[in-house]
Amino acid sequence: AAVPASASGVLLVDRAAIAENYRILKAAFLEKAVAAVVKADGYGLGAEQIVPSLVRAGARSFFVAQLDEALKLRPLLDRCHPAIALYVLNGLTPGTETLFADNTILPVLNSLGEIEAWSRFAQQRGTAQPAAIHLDSGMCRLGLPPDAVERLRGNPGALDGIVPTCILSHLACAEEPDNPKNAEQLAYLKQALTALPRAPVSFCNSSGIFLGRDYHFDLGRPGVALYGVNPTPAAPNPMRPVVRLLARILQIRAIDAPQTV
Ligand SMILES: *Cc1c(COP(=O)(O)O)cnc(C)c1O
């Protein structure tokens, strides 16, 4: 590959390497189901260019951050495969219920308020509505905090009309295998899951997959490792490189003191 004359640089994205990274992660996840996180336009590499390769490699669940990203990807995913689950991590913003349901996009419910809104919507429509439920096990960013989980335990009717297709939680320090936070989050998650109906559990981001089978549960949820970033920073990178930056050398100059640059 060369830099075209009209450009001073080119970023090359190797889609075959992304597909190979999906297979490497799936093998590390002991061949259980692995979703693909393609938020932020596929970590800046172009979600629409990447998604078909991931579907061909076997991905059947996708995660984005925002509903707008999901609305853009839904028709493409439908053309790739008839049964792709598409989740929005940022959750159910007020008034978006119809957009989610009519486009077969699944909200990740992050609070009791979102659970209440989705349950009410299901009852209004008269049909059960699928969704993921996000438990915060220590990341302290999004998801139900422990007190909300305990309120759900005491009031399972709050989930009426909701079909949980996935219960997810996010590791805060998985790239540090010796960090005690990992085991703390795992122990809390196991305890919190007893407050919820049974559903496939998704706990592992890229680095989490390499913490071993105790952390795996049912569905892997890697992002950055698909794109070649090392999920095990203390060890050699098991991923294939995906991105190559070529830049044109504009000029080479020979200079010497007292010249300055
Ligand atoms: C970004 C994100 C992921 C993917 O994490 P990586 O570290 O990029 O593998 C998984 N789950 C959630 C909730 C995220 O926000």
Predicted regions and their residues:
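Alpha-helical scaffold segments that flank or form the walls of functional sites
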Residues: 21-23
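N-terminal nucleotide-binding beta1-loop-alpha1 segment
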Residues: 26
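Active-site-proximal beta-alpha core segment in soluble small-molecule metabolic enzymes
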Residues: 5, 9-13, 17-19, 29-191, ...
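Short, basic/glycine-rich phosphate-binding loops at helix/coil junctions
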Residues: 1-2
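Anionic-ligand-binding alpha/beta catalytic cores of soluble enzymes and soluble regulatory domains
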Residues: 178-261
